[in-house]
A protein has these predicted regions:
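Conserved N-terminal phosphate-binding loop of PLP-dependent enzymes in the Aspartate aminotransferase
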Residues: 1-196
Length: 196
Protein backbone atom coordinates (compact mmCIF):
# COMPACT_ATOMS: atom_id res chain seq x y z
CA UNK A 1 0.00 0.00 0.00
CA UNK A 2 0.95 3.57 0.65
CA UNK A 3 3.68 2.64 3.10
CA UNK A 4 5.37 0.37 0.56
CA UNK A 5 5.55 3.28 -1.89
CA UNK A 6 7.09 5.61 0.68
CA UNK A 7 4.03 7.87 0.85
CA UNK A 8 3.42 7.44 4.56
CA UNK A 9 4.68 5.60 7.57
CA UNK A 10 2.77 4.69 10.71
CA UNK A 11 5.18 4.63 13.63
CA UNK A 12 4.26 3.26 17.02
CA UNK A 13 5.94 4.52 20.17
CA UNK A 14 6.20 2.66 23.47
CA UNK A 15 3.84 4.13 26.08
CA UNK A 16 5.54 6.40 28.62
CA UNK A 17 8.96 6.14 26.95
CA UNK A 18 9.84 9.83 26.56
CA UNK A 19 13.28 9.13 25.09
CA UNK A 20 11.82 7.01 22.31
CA UNK A 21 9.12 9.62 21.74
CA UNK A 22 11.73 12.35 21.33
CA UNK A 23 13.82 10.15 19.02
CA UNK A 24 10.82 9.38 16.81
CA UNK A 25 9.88 13.07 16.55
CA UNK A 26 13.49 13.94 15.68
CA UNK A 27 13.72 11.20 13.05
CA UNK A 28 10.37 11.93 11.40
CA UNK A 29 10.57 15.72 11.28
CA UNK A 30 13.51 16.10 8.95
CA UNK A 31 14.34 15.46 5.33
CA UNK A 32 11.41 13.96 3.48
CA UNK A 33 9.41 13.23 6.63
CA UNK A 34 6.91 15.31 8.59
CA UNK A 35 4.75 13.94 11.38
CA UNK A 36 1.11 14.16 10.33
CA UNK A 37 -0.45 13.54 13.76
CA UNK A 38 0.08 12.06 17.20
CA UNK A 39 -2.72 9.61 18.04
CA UNK A 40 -3.15 8.38 21.61
CA UNK A 41 -5.46 7.09 24.28
CA UNK A 42 -4.99 8.17 27.89
CA UNK A 43 -5.81 4.74 29.31
CA UNK A 44 -5.21 1.81 26.98
CA UNK A 45 -7.77 -0.75 28.10
CA UNK A 46 -6.66 -3.22 25.42
CA UNK A 47 -3.16 -3.12 26.93
CA UNK A 48 -3.98 -3.99 30.53
CA UNK A 49 -5.37 -0.53 31.35
CA UNK A 50 -1.94 1.04 30.87
CA UNK A 51 -2.19 4.74 31.68
CA UNK A 52 -0.07 7.38 29.99
CA UNK A 53 1.74 9.45 32.59
CA UNK A 54 1.19 13.19 32.95
CA UNK A 55 4.86 13.74 32.11
CA UNK A 56 4.63 11.69 28.91
CA UNK A 57 1.51 13.48 27.70
CA UNK A 58 2.97 16.92 28.48
CA UNK A 59 6.16 16.02 26.58
CA UNK A 60 4.22 14.62 23.62
CA UNK A 61 2.06 17.74 23.37
CA UNK A 62 5.14 19.99 23.64
CA UNK A 63 6.79 18.08 20.78
CA UNK A 64 3.60 18.36 18.75
CA UNK A 65 3.52 22.14 19.26
CA UNK A 66 7.20 22.40 18.31
CA UNK A 67 6.71 20.39 15.12
CA UNK A 68 3.26 21.72 14.18
CA UNK A 69 1.76 18.25 14.59
CA UNK A 70 -1.95 17.84 15.40
CA UNK A 71 -2.83 15.77 18.46
CA UNK A 72 -5.66 13.23 18.29
CA UNK A 73 -7.01 12.08 21.65
CA UNK A 74 -9.00 8.86 21.45
CA UNK A 75 -11.60 9.41 24.19
CA UNK A 76 -13.91 6.64 22.96
CA UNK A 77 -13.60 4.83 26.31
CA UNK A 78 -12.46 7.55 28.71
CA UNK A 79 -14.93 10.36 28.05
CA UNK A 80 -17.79 10.77 30.52
CA UNK A 81 -15.99 8.53 33.04
CA UNK A 82 -13.93 11.55 34.04
CA UNK A 83 -15.51 14.07 36.41
CA UNK A 84 -14.11 16.62 33.92
CA UNK A 85 -16.19 14.91 31.18
CA UNK A 86 -13.06 14.54 29.04
CA UNK A 87 -9.87 12.90 30.32
CA UNK A 88 -7.73 15.43 28.43
CA UNK A 89 -8.91 18.09 30.89
CA UNK A 90 -7.45 16.09 33.78
CA UNK A 91 -4.10 16.08 31.99
CA UNK A 92 -4.30 19.83 31.38
CA UNK A 93 -3.98 19.52 27.60
CA UNK A 94 -6.24 20.41 24.69
CA UNK A 95 -6.02 18.07 21.71
CA UNK A 96 -6.46 19.25 18.14
CA UNK A 97 -9.00 16.46 17.68
CA UNK A 98 -10.95 14.40 20.21
CA UNK A 99 -12.78 11.23 19.22
CA UNK A 100 -15.76 10.31 21.41
CA UNK A 101 -18.34 7.55 21.38
CA UNK A 102 -19.53 4.41 23.17
CA UNK A 103 -21.00 5.66 26.45
CA UNK A 104 -21.18 9.29 25.46
CA UNK A 105 -24.61 9.06 23.80
CA UNK A 106 -25.86 7.34 26.96
CA UNK A 107 -26.39 3.99 25.33
CA UNK A 108 -29.53 5.42 23.74
CA UNK A 109 -28.20 5.89 20.24
CA UNK A 110 -25.09 4.33 18.68
CA UNK A 111 -22.99 7.24 17.51
CA UNK A 112 -19.43 8.45 17.57
CA UNK A 113 -18.17 11.95 17.05
CA UNK A 114 -14.93 13.59 15.97
CA UNK A 115 -14.48 16.99 17.62
CA UNK A 116 -12.04 19.42 15.99
CA UNK A 117 -10.46 22.57 17.34
CA UNK A 118 -11.19 25.79 15.44
CA UNK A 119 -7.95 25.62 13.43
CA UNK A 120 -8.85 22.23 11.94
CA UNK A 121 -12.62 22.68 11.65
CA UNK A 122 -12.63 23.95 8.07
CA UNK A 123 -15.76 22.30 6.65
CA UNK A 124 -18.62 24.65 5.83
CA UNK A 125 -21.88 24.19 7.69
CA UNK A 126 -23.59 21.06 6.37
CA UNK A 127 -20.39 20.19 4.50
CA UNK A 128 -20.27 16.67 5.91
CA UNK A 129 -23.79 15.33 6.22
CA UNK A 130 -24.23 11.61 6.75
CA UNK A 131 -25.72 9.35 4.15
CA UNK A 132 -28.73 8.16 6.13
CA UNK A 133 -29.54 11.31 8.09
CA UNK A 134 -31.00 11.13 11.61
CA UNK A 135 -28.06 13.01 13.08
CA UNK A 136 -30.47 15.05 15.16
CA UNK A 137 -31.25 11.95 17.27
CA UNK A 138 -27.58 11.24 17.89
CA UNK A 139 -26.94 14.90 18.68
CA UNK A 140 -29.83 14.98 21.13
CA UNK A 141 -28.55 11.80 22.82
CA UNK A 142 -25.14 13.42 23.19
CA UNK A 143 -26.58 16.63 24.62
CA UNK A 144 -28.78 14.79 27.13
CA UNK A 145 -25.85 12.62 28.25
CA UNK A 146 -23.58 15.65 28.49
CA UNK A 147 -26.05 17.47 30.75
CA UNK A 148 -26.46 14.35 32.90
CA UNK A 149 -22.68 13.84 33.12
CA UNK A 150 -22.11 17.47 34.11
CA UNK A 151 -24.83 17.29 36.78
CA UNK A 152 -23.37 14.05 38.18
CA UNK A 153 -19.65 14.77 37.75
CA UNK A 154 -18.96 14.78 41.48
CA UNK A 155 -20.67 11.43 41.98
CA UNK A 156 -18.94 9.93 38.93
CA UNK A 157 -15.57 10.99 40.34
CA UNK A 158 -16.36 9.74 43.85
CA UNK A 159 -17.58 6.34 42.65
CA UNK A 160 -14.58 5.98 40.35
CA UNK A 161 -12.15 6.95 43.12
CA UNK A 162 -13.83 4.47 45.49
CA UNK A 163 -13.64 1.68 42.90
CA UNK A 164 -9.95 2.34 42.24
CA UNK A 165 -9.20 2.56 45.97
CA UNK A 166 -10.94 -0.78 46.61
CA UNK A 167 -9.02 -2.42 43.74
CA UNK A 168 -5.72 -1.15 45.13
CA UNK A 169 -6.69 -2.41 48.58
CA UNK A 170 -7.52 -5.80 47.06
CA UNK A 171 -4.12 -5.91 45.34
CA UNK A 172 -2.29 -5.06 48.58
CA UNK A 173 -4.13 -7.81 50.47
CA UNK A 174 -3.56 -10.39 47.72
CA UNK A 175 -0.10 -9.54 46.43
CA UNK A 176 0.63 -13.22 45.79
CA UNK A 177 -1.54 -13.58 42.70
CA UNK A 178 -2.09 -9.86 41.97
CA UNK A 179 0.82 -7.95 40.46
CA UNK A 180 -0.67 -4.47 40.11
CA UNK A 181 -3.66 -2.28 39.42
CA UNK A 182 -3.39 -0.13 36.31
CA UNK A 183 -5.59 2.60 34.86
CA UNK A 184 -7.71 5.19 36.62
CA UNK A 185 -11.09 5.10 38.37
CA UNK A 186 -13.72 3.17 36.37
CA UNK A 187 -11.15 2.34 33.71
CA UNK A 188 -8.90 0.12 35.77
CA UNK A 189 -7.44 -3.31 35.23
CA UNK A 190 -6.00 -6.04 37.43
CA UNK A 191 -2.65 -7.52 36.40
CA UNK A 192 -1.79 -11.00 37.66
CA UNK A 193 1.66 -12.48 38.22
CA UNK A 194 0.58 -15.64 36.40
CA UNK A 195 -2.38 -16.66 34.32
CA UNK A 196 -2.11 -20.27 35.57
Amino acid sequence: GLENHGLLRVRGVRPNDEKELEAVFAEYNQGRYKTAAFFHEFIMMNYGAARLTDSYIRRAYALCRKHDTPTVADEIQTCVWSPEIFMFREYGVTPSIAVVGKGFPGGEYPASRILFNAALDTLPLFGALVTNGQEELASLAYLVTLRWAEANAEVTGAVGDYYEERLRDLASRHSGPLASIEGRRHLAGINFHELG
